[in-house]
């Protein structure tokens, strides 16, 4: 297996313009495909997840052109639901941001489509979304294991009264929200259970509004969506930088700055993961906010005990930042780490122990006490981009770290290690 050993880093300094947000890129692509008119998307993320969405849209007859660096996409909308040219199978890798929204959108009209993906995708639950779509009339079959992909979709979604379980993934609600305006009937979506990662719903509502559709949100418990609507292209749309990707650089600044400045997100960003910077500030770093930048300057870091439900992806970065904080850090309410690219709670606990940390892994929390000195270890990445990037921070000590399968960062940040090296002074 390929590996990359990062030698100890003495200091991290400088600025980085972030690649586009994965969450925003794939939502914007789907809405542009469903909309009337032509949309020019700029700062689109070039990554595995986005390529899976683009390949699917192409197979569904959507015309687009990409710039040479794949960060600009000119896409001609379909002016309504996507139509398959006959029976179709779409392979979506391990891209949850493609699988969930497409599973809903392709239930409009009378398609016959199979959605499948990598082995890990077949372990990521989708039953709550399927249950909700069926309540709205969708005709869906599980082809292998009940409640998991692959799925066969045969259209039929018309809207109506729908309940969705919000406790596992906010992407199920996102998928329903984006699809419901195109259904023939009005839809009332009721959320049962506590809604996880609420800020991701704000991204969805924000983008829908950009494409001309507004819906009534009653305290995130009930959403009322008028049927028979159309999305309209905003013309040009700039995808903001990926706030989850920013977390690694901001954390590096907190641990071994200098000052690290990330551009492409800021106080005006719609992504909830910008709140990661507040957590670093609580731990002792100095944060400066601009409209389109966040800067982090090194501070004396101390442990925290916090509910991380609002920033589940960026919270992983706090788990490795905790190795440099005084005391025991506890991250709570993070059950949904278990249904991501891998079981991130198990993976994080396992790999933190390898570098010498004392770790308690709970059902929905993790408690981390750093060692006096970090140990050099081979870090398993579980084909999970965030595991690879989180553990790169171990090199901000006097100990090297070896990352196995480093190319898994291609899911959101193909040149991550090059960018980190550019801003680093070796010890």
From Swiss-Prot:
This protein's UniProt keywords: Amino-acid biosynthesis, Aromatic amino acid biosynthesis, Cytoplasm, Transferase
Main location: cytoplasm
Pathway given in the UniProt record: Metabolic intermediate biosynthesis; chorismate biosynthesis; chorismate from D-erythrose 4-phosphate and phosphoenolpyruvate: step 6/7
Keyword Transmembrane in record: no
Active-site residue list: 313
SUPFAM superfamilies attached to this UniProt entry: EPT/RTPC-like
Enzyme class: transferase
InterPro entries, per the entry: Enolpyruvate_Tfrase_dom, Enolpyruvate_Tfrase_sf, EPSP_synthase, EPSP_synthase_CS, RNA3'P_cycl/enolpyr_Trfase_a/b
Function: Catalyzes the transfer of the enolpyruvyl moiety of phosphoenolpyruvate (PEP) to the 5-hydroxyl of shikimate-3-phosphate (S3P) to produce enolpyruvyl shikimate-3-phosphate and inorganic phosphate.
Record protein name field: 3-phosphoshikimate 1-carboxyvinyltransferase
Lineage: Bacteria, Pseudomonadati, Pseudomonadota, Gammaproteobacteria, Enterobacterales
């Amino acid at each position: 297996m390929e590996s990359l050993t990062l030698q100890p880093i003495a200091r991290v300094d400088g600025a980085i313009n972030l690649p586009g947000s994965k969450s925003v890129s794939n939502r914007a692509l789907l809405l542009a495909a469903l909309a009337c008119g032509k949309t020019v998307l700029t700062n689109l993320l070039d990554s595995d997840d986005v390529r899976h969405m683009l390949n699917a849209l192409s197979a569904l007859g959507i015309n687009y052109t990409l710039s040479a660096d794949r960060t600009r996409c000119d896409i001609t909308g379909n002016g309504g639901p996507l139509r398959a040219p006959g029976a179709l199978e779409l392979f979506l890798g391990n891209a949850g941001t493609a699988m969930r929204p497409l599973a809903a959108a392709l239930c409009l009209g009378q398609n016959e489509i199979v959605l499948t993906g990598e082995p890990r995708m077949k372990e990521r639950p989708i039953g709550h979304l399927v249950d909700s779509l069926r309540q709205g009339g969708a005709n869906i079959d599980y082809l292998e294991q009940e409640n998991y992909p692959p799925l066969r979709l045969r259209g039929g979604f018309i809207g109506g009264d729908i309940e969705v379980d919000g406790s596992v993934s906010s992407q199920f609600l996102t998928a329903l929200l984006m699809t419901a305006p195109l259904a023939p009937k009005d839809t009332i979506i009721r959320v049962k259970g506590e809604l996880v990662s609420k800020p991701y719903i704000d991204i969805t509502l924000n983008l829908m509004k950009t494409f001309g559709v507004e819906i009534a949100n009653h305290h995130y418990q009930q959403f009322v969506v008028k049927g028979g609507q159309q999305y309209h292209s905003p013309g040009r749309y700039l995808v903001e930088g990926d706030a989850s990707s920013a977390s690694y650089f901001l954390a590096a600044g907190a641990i071994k700055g200098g000052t690290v400045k990330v551009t492409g997100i800021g106080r005006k960003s719609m992504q909830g993961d910008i709140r990661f910077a507040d957590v670093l500030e609580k731990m002792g770093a100095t944060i400066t906010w601009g409209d389109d930048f966040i800067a982090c300057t090194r501070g004396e870091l101390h442990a925290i005990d916090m509910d991380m439900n609002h920033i589940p992806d960026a919270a992983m970065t706090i788990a490795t930042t905790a190795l440099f904080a005084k005391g025991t850090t506890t991250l709570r309410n993070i059950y949904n780490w278990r249904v991501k690219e891998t079981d991130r709670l198990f993976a994080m606990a396992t790999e933190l122990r390898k570098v010498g940390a004392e770790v308690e892994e709970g059902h929905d929390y993790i408690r981390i006490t750093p060692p006096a000195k970090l140990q050099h270890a081979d870090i398993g990445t579980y084909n999970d981009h965030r595991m690879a990037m989180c553990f790169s921070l171990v090199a901000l000590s006097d100990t090297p770290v070896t990352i196995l399968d480093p190319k898994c960062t291609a899911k959101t940040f193909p040149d991550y290690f090059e960018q980190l090296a550019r801003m680093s002074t070796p010890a």
